[in-house]
A protein has these predicted regions:
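Beta-barrel outer-membrane channel/assembly domains of diderm bacteria
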Residues: 2-156, 162-167, 175, 185, ...
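Short amphipathic alpha-helix initiation/capping segments at coil-to-helix junctions
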Residues: 255, 284-287
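A beta-strand-loop signature enriched in Asp, Gly, Thr, and Trp
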Residues: 201-267, 272-280
């Protein structure tokens, strides 16, 4: 009898998670990269990155599974079996319990001008609801073991988000702010045709605050944006590729950065240029990164992107130039 009850319970559980709609989408890109470094031989690499996304929905419930299929093949290892890497990335479930939206699983954190989303945390959970036009979200994860509360909404044409982070474990992130509570504020609006954003981090940790702003406007078909981030001596900016591109990878604790970006369309091509200057806490570590990109949609449904990057590092002889051709 107990076995029959157990079988019935399992069958009921399996039925309850069946999905009415299942979709499978994906993307693929291939990159050829030539890197010419001062004092070293130039290198040529071909890499590919594929993603498959499986989504199942049943009413207001959704399950999302993302699988990455990457391969980093150089000219010398093109036939190496170790060059390919297939792994599960984001896996999460979202649903609603009354007026409360629930999401749980594994995913990347949200990009900000201070931090990219490279860190994927597990055991994530988010509970959110709207109260009088303000979205209130409470979230946490198994990696950091700290609860975060976010208030967001629009106030007189200004989008605002205020984040209160509880004390995380001191070894959870490797940053000075680990083990310390932080408050974050993000504002965005349009002033006389200029898109303006402002962000700040106020940490209980010593000399670990940061502030940043971006201003952008279109002039005669050319969008010009300026971004600036100022970090205290113990805070490290890990970057937002939209603002600082690859230059964020050169930033260390206490470094500041400024970026100017221009973007326009020419004969069906999207053309952009970005000039980033990293003002390092140690002057000998200053870096300038200039990037030029041309993107064009092709008739076959793919997109061709050509990027040239020139990196000039102060006090070193490892300046380099990189040409990257991407088909996606």
């Amino acid at each position: 009898m107990k076995k029959q009850l157990l079988i019935a319970a399992v069958a009921a559980t399996m039925t309850s998670v069946a999905f009415a709609d299942i979709s499978l989408t994906g993307s693929m890109k291939v990159n050829y990269t030539n890197k010419d470094t001062v004092g070293a031989a130039s290198t040529n690499t071909v890499t590919q990155e594929g993603d498959l996304v499986l989504t199942g929905t049943n009413g207001g419930t959704k399950v999302h599974v993302e699988v990455s299929i990457d391969g980093g093949n150089s000219t010398g290892t093109a036939n190496s079996s170790s060059a390919n890497n297939m792994r599960t990335e984001d896996v999460w479930l979202s649903t609603n319990i009354g007026s409360v939206a629930v999401k749980t699983g594994t995913w990347n954190l949200t990009d900000t001008i201070f931090n990219d989303n490279a860190t994927r945390t597990t055991g994530n959970w988010v509970l959110s609801t709207d109260v009088s036009g303000v979205n209130i979200a409470v979230e946490g994860d198994s990696n950091v073991s700290a609860v975060k509360t976010t208030l967001s909404g629009d106030i007189a044409g200004v989008s605002a988000k205020y984040v209160m982070k509880g004390t995380a474990s001191a070894t959870s992130t490797g940053k000075a702010t680990a083990g310390k509570a932080t408050n974050e504020l993000y504002l965005g609006t349009n002033v006389a045709g200029f898109d303006v954003t402002y962000a700040m981090i106020d940490s209980d940790a010593t000399t670990s605050d940061a502030a940043a702003f971006t201003i952008a406007k279109e002039f005669n078909g050319v969008t010009i944006s300026y971004s600036d981030v100022d970090a205290d001596a113990s805070y490290k900016v890990t970057g937002d590729t939209a603002a600082f591109g690859n230059a964020a990878g050169f930033m260390n604790i206490g470094d500041d950065a400024k970026a100017i970006k221009l973007a326009t369309s020419v004969a069906g091509n999207t053309v952009s240029a970005r000039f980033v200057s990293v003002d390092a806490l140690v002057a000998a570590n200053d870096v300038d990164v200039n990037t030029f990109t041309v993107t064009r949609p092709l008739a076959g449904g793919t997109t061709l992107e050509v990027t040239y990057t020139d990196t000039d590092e102060s006090g070193t002889t490892v300046d380099n130039e990189v040409l990257d051709v991407e088909l996606a």
